[in-house]
Design a protein with these regions (language model features):
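Glycine-rich, phosphate-binding/catalytic loops in enzymes
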Residues: 27-28, 89-92, 134, 152
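Compact structured core domains
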Residues: 57-111, 115-123
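Short amphipathic alpha-helical segments
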Residues: 22-24, 53, 84-88, 130, ...
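Structural signal for interior beta-strand "rungs" in well-ordered beta-sheet cores
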Residues: 99-194
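Short, flexible, glycine/charge-rich loop motifs used to bind or transfer phosphoryl groups or to couple energy/partner
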Residues: 1, 28-32, 47, 60-64, ...
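A general structural motif
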Residues: 5-6, 36-38, 69, 93, ...
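A solvent-exposed beta-alpha-beta segment
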Residues: 4-79
C-alpha cells in the first residue's frame, strides 16, 4: 500500500469547474484506497492554502512534492489551455488522469482517451469513440455512433445525438442540441467550433 500512498493526484484548476471535479476525484480515489491527503488542487493563480478541504499547490510545488508518481486531471474549460497543460504535464512526467462520476452510464463499445472528465448524470450510449481530455459536464449525453475528438468541451446539458463527428477543440455550450446525422453521412461539428 505504501507505493500507492506515495502517488500524488491533482485536479489542475481550482476555479468553479475544478471545485466540481474535486469531489468526484476524491470519491474515485477513496474507492481505489488512496488517502484523501494525496489529492491536491493545482493552480497557477495564487489562492488560499486549502479549498474545500484539499491543499492548493502551484504547479512548481506539485512537481516538488515527494511522490512516487504524479497524476493530473485538467479541469480547465478552454481546450487550447488544456492542450498546453497536457503537453507541459507530459514533458514533466505527470501522468494524464481521468475522473468519472460514480453515476455515469457507459454502455457497449465506448472507447475513451486519456484524461477524460465525466461529470454526474453523463450518459454515453453504444459504439462511441471519445478523444483525449474530453469534458462531459453534468447531464450531457453522447448517443450511438459518435466520434468526438481531442480537447472537446461539452458544457452542462449537451445533447449529442447519433452519427455525429465532433472535431478537436470544439466547445458545445450549455443545453445545446446537436441533431442526428445519417449512418455513413455523419453530421460534422468542425474543429474549434464554438
Amino acid at each position: 500500500a505504501n507505493t500507492m500512498q506515495s502517488e500524488l493526484y491533482a485536479v489542475y484548476g481550482a476555479s468553479g469547474y475544478g471545485r466540481e471535479v474535486m469531489p468526484l476525484a476524491r470519491q474515485q480515489l477513496a474507492q481505489a484506497g488512496v488517502a484523501p491527503d494525496r489529492l491536491v488542487f493545482v493552480d497557477d493563480a495564487p489562492g488560499p492554502a486549502q479549498i474545500n478541504g484539499q491543499r492548493l499547490l502551484t504547479y512548481a510545488q506539485f512537481l516538488a512534492e515527494p511522490a512516487a508518481a504524479r497524476h493530473a486531471v485538467l479541469a480547465i474549460a478552454s481546450g487550447g489551455v488544456r492542450e498546453k497543460l497536457a503537453q507541459r504535464c507530459t514533458q514533466d512526467g505527470v501522468h494524464a488522469w481521468g475522473v468519472t462520476a460514480a453515476n455515469v452510464v457507459r454502455m457497449d463499445a465506448v472507447a475513451l482517451g486519456e484524461g477524460v472528465i465525466l461529470s454526474p448524470f453523463v450518459t454515453l450510449t453504444s459504439n462511441i469513440r471519445i478523444g483525449r481530455h474530453f469534458h462531459g459536464n453534468i447531464y450531457s449525453y453522447v448517443a450511438h455512433d459518435c466520434v468526438i475528438g481531442d480537447f472537446v468541451t461539452f458544457a452542462p446539458g449537451v445533447m449529442c445525438n447519433g452519427n455525429i463527428v465532433v472535431e478537436d477543440h470544439a466547445y458545445i455550450g450549455t443545453g445545446a442540441v446537436i441533431k442526428q446525422g445519417q449512418p455513413g453521412n455523419p453530421l460534422v461539428i468542425g474543429r474549434g467550433a464554438v
